């Protein structure tokens, strides 16, 4: 498949396939054959790196056809999947694999690595993946138009809002299609979400950290791009909003696994174990071996409840914060706010939504206090920028209400060991 992709892709651009390319391909095949040996686990990671390149190559060379882009994406994901997603897991120490608990010490019969917990993240990653691939197809010139039901572009531009956003100077500043990079990140999220057992919080710490990095910081970057759309570009992108919402909702479902892995590494360090080695190979932990798997032989309603509510719930005060944040983002329409005041309302509203949704995770409840300075900012901005009387009253009320709502923690139904002191 690797040979067929490279030959097809190069001929698609009208280029001759050099001999060195075939040498590289056959060497890669040799590595793939070596990876079949259980003693040569590193060869599987070499194959995974080849798969990563196959994911990126259509973006790096601006794939001229949709078939070339689809071929690279599909084969790249399959190469990575068959290299490192299948069992036995690569690089996990025997101590981590055969001893130790399923639940982190001190946690109340709840493992953040169970499939019920990962399923919402993987589902949302698929949503973002398909949206990003669709946007990439337009950026690569594979389709002539893109769906946009709500937002128009500039008056002197026949493009709609989505088309204008993804062909703007911000997007074109990247050397490759930025939507394609998003699709690649979502693909990696899907695959890292599938790696490892229900004990991967201690058997594969580096995978958990990589998974968290792809979701939390990159999710914040995605939200930042949404924030700048009306401020710098003057319009919106419906599909970008949906993808950003999918990324944002992933954050509360992913942070508890990061907390469990951080606690595990801290305990191993206190025990005098080699931290760097354990980070890559995992280790055992306090507690007895528990050979437990996810129980899918339940009522669908019970499974759905476990998927949605595992370590995550929506306190009424944080739900109201999300609504107020959305209301602030719409003051251009509701109060006719313009200029710097409209930009300030939009920026603060988006940050309030991000903070409140993140705090849906019980392990992140302390983070809600960041809403207080955002509320204080709302009490200042009406006196800095021009605003109507109605807009002034609205902003001041929103600021006071946000400060009051952020004081309540909300219920927490699980225990998180030493992290409980931060769930308040």
Language-model segments: residues:
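A domain-level signal for the structural core that forms small-molecule/cofactor-binding pockets
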Residues: 381-383
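Membrane-interfacial helix-loop segments of redox and metal-homeostasis proteins
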Residues: 7-32, 39-47, 53, 59-348, ...
């Amino acid at each position: 498949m690797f040979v067929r992709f490279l030959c097809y892709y190069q001929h698609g651009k009208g280029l001759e396939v050099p001999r060195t390319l075939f040498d590289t391909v056959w060497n890669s095949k040799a590595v793939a054959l070596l990876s079949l040996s259980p003693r040569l686990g590193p060869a599987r990671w070499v194959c995974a790196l080849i798969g990563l390149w196959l994911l990126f190559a259509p973006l790096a060379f601006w794939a001229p056809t949709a078939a070339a882009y689809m071929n690279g994406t599909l084969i790249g994901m399959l190469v990575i999947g068959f290299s490192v997603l299948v069992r036995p897991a690569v690089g996990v120490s025997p101590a981590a694999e055969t001893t130790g608990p399923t639940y982190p010490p001190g946690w109340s019969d709840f493992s953040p690595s169970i499939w019920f917990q990962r399923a919402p993240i993987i589902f949302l990653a698929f949503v973002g993946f398909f949206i990003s691939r669709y946007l990439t197809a337009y950026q690569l010139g594979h389709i002539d138009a893109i769906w946009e039901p709500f937002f128009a572009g500039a008056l002197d531009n026949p493009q709609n809002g989505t088309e204008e956003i993804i062909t703007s100077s911000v997007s074109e500043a990247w050397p490759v299609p930025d939507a394609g990079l998003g699709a690649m990140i979502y693909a990696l999220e899907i695959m890292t979400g599938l790696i490892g057992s229900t004990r991967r919080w201690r058997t594969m710490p580096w995978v958990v950290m990589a998974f968290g990095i792809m979701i939390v910081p990159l999710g914040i970057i995605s939200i930042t791009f949404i924030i700048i759309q009306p401020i710098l570009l003057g319009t919106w992108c419906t599909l970008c909003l949906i993808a950003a919402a999918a990324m944002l909702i992933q954050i509360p479902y992913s942070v508890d696994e990061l907390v469990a892995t951080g606690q595990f590494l801290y305990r191993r360090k206190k025990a005098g174990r080699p931290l760097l080695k354990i980070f890559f190979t995992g280790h055992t932990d306090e507690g007895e071996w528990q050979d437990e798997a996810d129980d899918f032989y339940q009522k669908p309603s019970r499974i759905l409840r476990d998927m949605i509510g595992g370590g995550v719930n929506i306190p009424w005060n944080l739900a109201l914060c999300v609504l107020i944040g959305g209301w602030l983002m719409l003051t251009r329409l509701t109060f006719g706010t313009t200029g710097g005041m409209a930009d300030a309302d939009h920026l603060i509203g988006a940050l309030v939504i991000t903070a409140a949704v993140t705090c849906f995770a019980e392990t992140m409840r302390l983070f809600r206090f960041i809403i207080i300075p955002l509320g204080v900012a709302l009490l200042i901005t009406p006196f800095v920028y021009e605003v109507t009387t109605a807009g002034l009253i609205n902003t001041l009320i929103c600021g006071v209400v946000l400060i009051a709502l952020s004081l309540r923690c909300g219920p927490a139904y699980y225990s998180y060991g030493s992290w409980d002191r931060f769930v308040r």
